[in-house]
Structure formats: structure tokens, C-alpha cells
Amino acid sequence: MCSSDLRRAVSDIGVLPGHLATAVLGLNEAQLDTPYRPEGWTVRQVVHHVADSHMNAFVRLKMALTENRPGVSAYDEKKFAMLGDTQLPVTVSLELVRSLHARWLAIYGTMTETDWQRTFIHPEYPEPLTLDWQVQMYGWHSRHHVAHITALRRREGW
């Protein structure tokens, strides 16, 4: 990844906590429990999914930085989205994401060019994944899910 792509991805991860909080600001319980698309997750589930997904990514980052090509586990995000913790107030996951991203950025700030090339093995991908790939993917993931919520708000006039 070129340095401008890397900077953008790190920036996207850095601003996600604020963007996600703003995206759900002022929504009532019924709105939080509205799917962002037919057959899709509710806004509440999306917020909790971001926390789940980014926790997994953070642990994978730490493993890749401290182990030699570690294998990581896949998880069923659809099943995760159905567990009881996804009925909690979104503030629980918003605070988790805020704290997690502060730690994530602290690590990113200390990484060398060599660190960004470190890899981990994911069972759903045929090749090892680099940390520069991971940061770009989660920068996209951050924008992607905020856009789901903001598009729903525009459609519904919220």
C-alpha cells in the first residue's frame, strides 16, 4: 500500500468512533431497531457488529506483530449479531469502539514499514494477509457501516 493509502486508512479508523456516534445521535429505540435494508441488520446490530469486528481485527493485529505468521480464527458475524449482547444500548459499543480505536491508533503510530508487511493466516483467504491490507480493509469497513446508517436516516427523513 502506498503511504497516502495507509494514511487515509489509519485516518478512517481514527475518525470512526465520532462518525459512528454522530450517525446514531438522536435515534430512538424504534429507529435503532430498524433494519438498514430489507433482510439486513438493524442499526443497533450494525453498531454492535462494528465493535465485534474491530475487536477481532485488533487482536489479529497484535498477534501478527508478536508472532510469526499466526493463524487466526474466523467467526460467524451473522450468529454474533443474534447474541444477547446486541440488545444492549448502542452506547455500550460506542464506548468500546472509542476506547479500542484509541489503542489501535497508539499501535499504528509505532509501526515501522516492516511491521506493515507482517502477515497472519486467515482460513477464509488463500494467501497470508498483510497488516497494510488489514488497515485498508478496516478503513473501508468503518466507512461502509457508517454509510449504512446515514443512508437509512436520509431515506427515512430522520
What are these regions (language model features)?
Residues L6-P17, G40-V47, V90-L94, D132-V135:
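Amphipathic, non-membrane alpha-helical segments in soluble helical-bundle scaffolds
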Residues D33-K78, L83, L105-A106, Q117-W158:
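Short, contiguous alpha-helical
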Residues M1-S3:
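Short, small-residue-biased leader/transition segments that mark boundaries at the very start
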Residues A23, L27-A30, N68, M111-T114, ...:
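A short secondary-structure junction motif
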Residues D12-A23, F80-R118, Y138:
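Acidic/histidine-rich alpha-helical segments that form the ligand environment
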Residues G14-G40:
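A glycine-rich, hydrophobic loop/mini-helix early in the fold
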Residues R7-V10, A21, R143-V146:
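Low-complexity, intrinsically disordered short peptide segments enriched in small/polar/basic residues
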